[in-house]
Amino acid sequence: RPGKETVFGPAHLVVEDVPLPLAVPYGFFPFNKNYSSGFIMPSYVDETVRGFYLRDGGYYWAINDYMDLKALGEIYTKGSWGTSVETNYNKRYKYRGNVYFSFLRTVEGEKNMPDYQVTKSFKLQWTHSKDSRANPNTTFSARVNFASESYERKNLESMYNPLSYTQSTRASSVSFSHTFPTIGLSIAASANLTQNMRDSTIAMTLPDVSFSLARFYPFRRKYSVGKERWYEKISVSYTGQLSNSITTKEDKLFKSNLVKDWRNGFQHRVPIDATFQLFKYINISPNLSF
């Protein structure tokens, strides 16, 4: 039946155009239009520092047609463990994105010995994009790639992947903008973060907001009657920016003081212009900005 299942009669197996003496009397393949949830079997391996472990086992949940969720875990015989959660979402003609979070608790050495060490590390990744057809006057996007300084050194995949150590910096950004067409006002806001993985230095700007108001004529009459007055030619526009930034170490970021450690400020510009005609032949264009 079209769209339901496929049924076939007697068949034999062929590998690289070579028929094999393996046959089946019939076959039945149903079509399933829905995503399926289920358990993910872990892998069992031995690692020198952390011992035997079960890794990448968990559960996949097909929440609906727009979102899924995958939760994985890993556990080691010498006390280390980790977990990760990843979700994908996609709303057609509106937005799409992916979120990934991983946490590791790594135990190295023997307890009560000088080399004993417990390290907690994490990684957060988020990508999001908005379809312009959903709302042409609004944009929102995110590209976040943040990890604690010790994550790549403790993550098992990175330990055996030399390319991961070549990435010395990580960059993250989240941006939003909205335009009010009826009044000519535009607002844009963003948060940016650059992370140096070698010395755990973080440069963050949170937030960075800009405003702009299109040129308008405040003294122009709503209903113009007769000749245009001289003051009706005066135009005004506006731009402004608010910024708040800091450069610090990873372990000091949440202990920083907004007044002492952060650099913040606000600047704006208000241009006032006009164009007048003198004696029908000379144009005068005075302007003032503050």
Where are these predicted regions, by residue range?
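Outer-membrane beta-barrel proteins and related beta-barrel translocases across Gram-negative bacteria
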Residues: 1-290
